[in-house]
Structures are given as structure tokens and as C-alpha cells.
Amino acid sequence: MATSQIAIIVLLGLLVATNIHITEAQIGVCYGMMGNNLPSHSEVIQLYKSRNIRRLRLYDPNHGALNALRGSNIEVILGLPNVDVKHISSGMEHARWWVQKNVRDFWPHVKIKYIAVGNEISPVTGTSNLAPFQVPALVNIYKAIGEAGLGNDIKVSTSVDMTLIGNSYPPSQGSFRNDVRWFTDPIVGFLRDTRAPLLVNIYPYFSYSGNPGQISLPYALFTAPNVVVQDGSRQYRNLFDAMLDSVYAAMDRTGGGSVGIVVSESGWPSAGAFGATHENAQTYLRNLIQHAKEGSPRKPGPIETYIFAMFDENNKNPELEKHFGMFSPNKQPKYNLNFGVSERVWDITNSTASSLTSEI
């Protein structure tokens, strides 16, 4: 075989390997709709596709958005809103109806990957009244998904925040608060038994803005030049990893060492509060996208991560919540971000690879 032909084969192998790596580390983006000036659902999904964003989180089963997603090949976290959790927990008939109307009617044309039953429900926040219904709702939706024949395709989980963590420093000593163990232990057990990941919302911004005297901005933005936290043999240069690994440690302590984590939200506001600037937000998002390929000291490897959020949403409060978007409502990007090789480039690569192969 000629040297040039060998070189072409090696090149093709590298292209395939690169494509796989990009897919594994692909970042998703949360599609919030709390704005009165946002683009149509079809425009939004087209924007996802044009920017090579292949994963999306929906906070409720908006049928306009789900219809726009048909045939897009975008993977979806589909939210079951907090307002429906108690109702779903009360009987299988409600869970079956919800799954039929919001999942089965769209599958497989919409690639629903996870169902997030509730968002940030916690016994120690304003959602405490829903906490007793969380696990029954999870179980009912899980059973309904199984009855619909989708148990091997769609995982059922819930999205939590860091308020459930009692100790997070050092990360290896992470643990759930004692007063929420009645809530977290059954969730971790459910996820372990069903082999589903825990969805976790991780925001270094809020930790930094609440404790700027103890947490440095570079540590929060992935830009610290040196190790900030030495935890045994593990070294931490960024707060994101430390927060993530503290949750892994907490689950390990409750029998959930085999449970994976999906970072279901992470972002940085560009205005509206302390430390919320365009420069900081761009730095954080750029570095988060890159870091998702690498993993944490405790769990190396790609981290499935969803950026919050696609758009600035002017109906949210307080003020900083209006400024988490990567795009303005007119679809103009606020930052220069790269989500990997564009679909157009990969089309060119694939056609070139095909023609090269035919010549060997």
C-alpha cells in the first residue's frame, strides 16, 4: 500500500476519533421561556442546530417546543414541573396520562433522554411542601415509562441544587445535610436501583458572590494558575470540580457510589449583581465548555453538562436572573463560544472522507 494511502487511512481514523470525542463531551443548553420577547419555538430549535448544540433541557412539556424538536436529533431532558409533582405522586393513572401525552406521543421523533421529575425540590427551601411527594412521583413516572415500553431508552431522575449538601469542604468529605437525609437517601437509592444519574445544578457564581472574601474569582472562573485545594492526592484548581466532587462523595456515603451525575444547570450572569459582568460570564462559559471534556479529579472523563441558559429572560426575578442567556432575544450571541465542529464542517468532512475512501 502506498505511503500516501496509509496517511489517508490514518487521517480518517483521526477524524472519526475526533468526532466521537466531541460527541461524548457535547454541551447542552437549557431552553427557558420566561420572556415576552423570545423567538418562536421553530426558530429556537434552528438556532440550536446551527450552533451545533445537540442537547437541550426543557423545564416543562411545552408541546410547541416538542413539536419543533421532531426530527432534530437533539437529545432532551424533559421536565415534569414542580406544580405537577404532587398530582403525579397520587396515582399511576396520572403518571400514565402524563407519559402518554408528553412522552409517548412524541417518541421516537423527539429524542427524550431523561425525565426530570421536579426541579430543586428541597425540604429546606420554599419547595419543602413538595418534598414528601418527590419519590412517589419518581416511582410512578418510572413505572409508566416502563409500561410504555421505553424503560431502556429514557431514564427518570430529578434535578437538585447544592442546598442539600451540608459539608462540601474538602470535596472528599462531602455529605448531605442530616436534616434532609430522609429525602435524599431514597432518591439516591432509587437512582442506584434504576441505573439513572442524579441531575445537579452547580453554580460557582453563587458560591463566589456569597463569599468573595473566602473564594477567589479565578477559582470560580477556571482561571486559577495554581492548585487552590489539596484534598489528599486530588488537586483542585476550580470551584466547579470541588462542588461536583462533594456531591459524588455525598452519594458515596449514602450507598450511591455507582450513581452518575449530569450537571443539569450551570452558568454565570452578565449583569444584575455582584460579579455579574459580560467578561466574567464569557470567561466562565468558555472554560466550562472546554472543561466538560475533562472531568473532575474524582471522576475523570466527559461530564454531560447543560448551560443555563439559551436566552436572557425578561420576566424572571430578581434582576440577575434576567441575564443568564447566551443569546439576546433577537438571537444575537452575547459571547464568542464554540460548541465544537459545526454540522456543516462535518458534512464536508464526511463527504471528503467518502471520496478519499473510494480512491484507496
UniProtKB/Swiss-Prot annotation:
Give the InterPro entries listed for this entry.
Glyco_hydro_17, Glyco_hydro_17_plant, Glycoside_hydrolase_SF
Leading EC class: hydrolase
A cellular component term from Gene Ontology for this protein is: vacuole
Q: Which residues form the propeptide?
A: 341-360
Single annotated GO MF: glucan endo-1,3-beta-D-glucosidase activity
**Positions of the catalytic residues:** 120 (proton donor), 265 (nucleophile)
Q: Which residues are glycosylated?
A: 350
Q: What does this protein do?
A: Implicated in the defense of plants against pathogens.
Q: What is this protein called?
A: Glucan endo-1,3-beta-glucosidase B
